[in-house]
Amino acid sequence: MSLFAIFYLFLAYLLGSVSSAILLCRLAGLPDPRESGSHNPGATNVLRIGGRWVALSVLLFDMLKGMLPVWLGYYLGLTHFELGMVALGACLGHIFPIFFKFKGGKGVATAFGAIAPISWGVAGSMLGTWLLIFFVSGYSSLSAVMTALLVPFYVWWFKPEFTFPVALVCCLLIYRHHDNIQRLWRGQEDKVWNKLKNKKD
């Protein structure tokens, strides 16, 4: 990697470290997502604690944290491998944010934003897989894990030169969901709409 690419990767990490869930919940007067719901500072948990529009804002911001540095890096002439490392850097920032004591979210939206610019085919396949599994199962975590397992194959089909760096990002996502995987295996993971229903009750 070039010195510029390393510097740019660091900038992507810093952008990823800006936790929109924490900041927007503060602005909206909602509880700290790290201390409420699933204790995960991400869009799904913000939705659980009662902020529909805030959750949508968090989702969009987190996607942009991954998308913008990768897109700009492409036009700056970074290699495929360097772009993959930039995507990984943005995801690492979201998961281990330097501004919030290295305690961040799962990185799903940021990873989607970082991988989506590769091609419309990859973006559509990712989104379609996540939505299908979510509406069938009701588990956000299962949707994320299964999508992460399949994304490298989508990338290999549409843009094979990005397969290795994207696979690294997906491995990071699966690792970040290890607690969810254990709860799913034990049958202890809650469905998203059950939590929303319980909150209304």
Curated annotation (Swiss-Prot):
Transmembrane segments: 3-23, 53-73, 80-100, 115-135, 153-175
Catalytic activity: an acyl phosphate + sn-glycerol 3-phosphate = a 1-acyl-sn-glycero-3-phosphate + phosphate
GO biological process: phospholipid biosynthetic process
Subcellular location: Cell inner membrane
Enzyme class: transferase
Main location per the UniProt record: membrane
InterPro entries listed in its UniProt record: G3P_acylTferase_PlsY
Pathway: Lipid metabolism; phospholipid metabolism
Keywords: Cell inner membrane, Cell membrane, Lipid biosynthesis, Lipid metabolism, Membrane, Phospholipid biosynthesis, Phospholipid metabolism, Transferase, Transmembrane, Transmembrane helix
Record-linked NCBIfam families: glycerol-3-phosphate 1-O-acyltransferase PlsY
Protein name, as recorded: Glycerol-3-phosphate acyltransferase
